Amino acid sequence: MAVRKLKPTTPGQRHKIIGTFEEITASVPEKSLVYGKKSSGGRNNEGKMTMRYIGGGHRKVIRIVDFKRNKDGVPAVVKTIEYDPNRSARIALLYYADGEKRYIIAPNGLQVGATLMSGETAAPEIGNTLPLQNIPVGTVIHNIELRPGQGAALVRSAGNFAQLTSREGKYCVIKLPSGEVRQILSTCKATIGSVGNSDHGLERSGKAGRSRWQGRRPRNRGVVMNPVDHPMGGGEGRSSGGHPRSRKGLYAKGLKTRAPKKQSSKYIIERRKK
């Protein structure tokens, strides 16, 4: 997908860089694969704020995306490539040979009319999903499971990809987009190729209003708050706020937040890059 920069006819247009949407082939989603959901506005069931800077925004319809790809051996044809307001990637509508319809994350280079497969017998081609043990070493992959049958949990956002680097016994070694290198069971599934909409990172909103359309409210700095609201608040005049801290009082720069005795740490060969 390409991006376009608009002429600076207004202040909001001057810095705006948005996608061209040229790959989108349908504007109305498949009715059987969507449902409505009321926006929480960052409040919980008691009406209390649990997440700041969320509220407003355009109404969204949730698309049901298939992250399990468990219809093994049944071919599917790509019918449309669609926009999904709930994620950075595009989604593709699949028509299976037995009549079922499902949405998947659209990988880079996927075309309408292509035939996709999943399962151990599937070929390692773009959009096909198969166990890691059946994928050649060095292949670029996305939508990776952490547990067999759980559904894809890793590498799902626009433009991202991981690489299968080697095999060690019943595990495969995967290099993730963060730079982390970790072992994952060979029976876990992954999809061939990288996630589409790779130019998403180049987009710029151009104005505050576009952020509000997306449900993002202004984010205040802690140093301009009062002491009751933030550890860095208060002081006479413009003060530095002291050592950078989070709203809960934890050091904000360099403090490790991962649990030291986390069970999955033994599968991590190389920690992610900062």
Swiss-Prot record:
SMART domains: Ribosomal_L2, Ribosomal_L2_C
Gene expressing this chain: rplB
Lineage, highest ranks first: Bacteria, Pseudomonadati, Bacteroidota, Bacteroidia, Bacteroidales
Residues that span the membrane, as ranges: none
One biological process term in Gene Ontology: cytoplasmic translation
Biased composition, class Basic residues, residue ranges: 207-220, 244-264
Name of the protein in question: Large ribosomal subunit protein uL2
One cellular component (GO) term of this entry: large ribosomal subunit
Family, per entry: Belongs to the universal ribosomal protein uL2 family.
GO molecular function, one term: RNA binding
Plastid keyword on record: no
HAMAP family reported for this sequence: Ribosomal_uL2_B
Region of interest called Disordered, as start-end residue ranges on this chain: 195-274
Function: One of the primary rRNA binding proteins. Required for association of the 30S and 50S subunits to form the 70S ribosome, for tRNA binding and peptide bond formation. It has been suggested to have peptidyltransferase activity; this is somewhat controversial. Makes several contacts with the 16S rRNA in the 70S ribosome.
Quaternary organization: Part of the 50S ribosomal subunit. Forms a bridge to the 30S subunit in the 70S ribosome.
Cystine pairings recorded for this chain: none
Key words of the record: Ribonucleoprotein, Ribosomal protein, RNA-binding, rRNA-binding
